[in-house]
From Swiss-Prot:
[2Fe-2S] cluster binds at C105, C136, C196, R268. Residues 46-273 form the Radical SAM core domain. The keyword GTP-binding does not apply. Belongs to the radical SAM superfamily. Biotin synthase family. This is Biotin synthase. Binds 1 [4Fe-4S] cluster. The cluster is coordinated with 3 cysteines and an exchangeable S-adenosyl-L-methionine. Binds 1 [2Fe-2S] cluster. The cluster is coordinated with 3 cysteines and 1 arginine. It catalyses: (4R,5S)-dethiobiotin + (sulfur carrier)-SH + 2 reduced [2Fe-2S]-[ferredoxin] + 2 S-adenosyl-L-methionine = (sulfur carrier)-H + biotin + 2 5'-deoxyadenosine + 2 L-methionine + 2 oxidized [2Fe-2S]-[ferredoxin]. The gene is bioB.
Amino acid sequence: MNAHTAGGHALRHDWTLSEVQALFALPFNDLLFQAQTIHRAHFDPNEVQVSTLLSIKTGACPEDCKYCPQSARYHTGLETERLMEVEKVLERAREARANGSSRFCMGAAWRNPKERDMPYILRMIEEVRGLGMETCMTLGMLTADQAARLGAAGLDYYNHNLDTSPEFYGEIISTRTYQDRLDTLEHVRGAGMKVCSGGIVGMGEQAKDRAGLLMALANLPRHPESVPINMLVKVKGTPLENEANLDSFEFIRTIAVARIMMPASHVRLSAGREKMNEQMQAMCFMAGANSIFYGCKLLTTPNPDENSDMQLFKRLGIRPAQRAQKPDQIQEEEILAEVSRQNAPDEMFYDATRPRAGVARS
């Protein structure tokens, strides 16, 4: 068996489709009991990691992902925005930290980052880390060199989802291959960063495709440290705007099976949460979800606001996880970040609405 042990449970990388389908087929209570038992062996069951996601460059993406309102191929009414100024990103990061987030995720609607944008991206990473927060980015596909530069700047996590099963993937995206995604994850690992990778359910896939997605994730050489499970957010103007709703229990089953297959990973209750009532969210936490995105938007789609999240946490006895860092270390990093900012050359900060002379921005 291809496995190693963590917390008393074997971390497997050799799942078969029939095994995963058997988990999905368990009676609901049995499935949740198994998932919760495994969850408690690896995590505090009443602690949830809280992240904030900011779109640092919005819209005009050349890809054709059928679920995505940021694709330039679909008319969704989304207002495109250029790459944000570094200081504006830091303002949002400070707000996120004050509201309880321990991780700040930055997303750009690109096929892949351009060289002209890399200095600003690297500066964002360094400055946000200086606030004492974990950093995560999703910028599209990466070369090995780009991944190495992000890692050297201190990026903690890189998000690149597999989206769905290899078999269903071609029904959703044609502008990049499944192997392209796997290659990017390999580059991220090679650069020493942690992997955030999951998928979207409710896109018209079959049950075997949800099983296939989780199998692809769990059979990676190393499990992703973070596994976001997204419910499709149907946006008018995208090809999936009229897709039928996925059964709520099927979504909860997906969370539970992800927890069983990847025991030591954070399973994130991600997009689509705004449409879930409190009871469904509570069942997802029982099934093993222990991470959420926090705030009013997930890139370009709605998300529950901070107050409703904290009220639900209080009712459930859940508390936000804190980054393992001493207060004096955070204070020291803040001072160093402020000194660095004051001494930085002006050209590192720019108005994203006014391209710098001689530089075209996408």
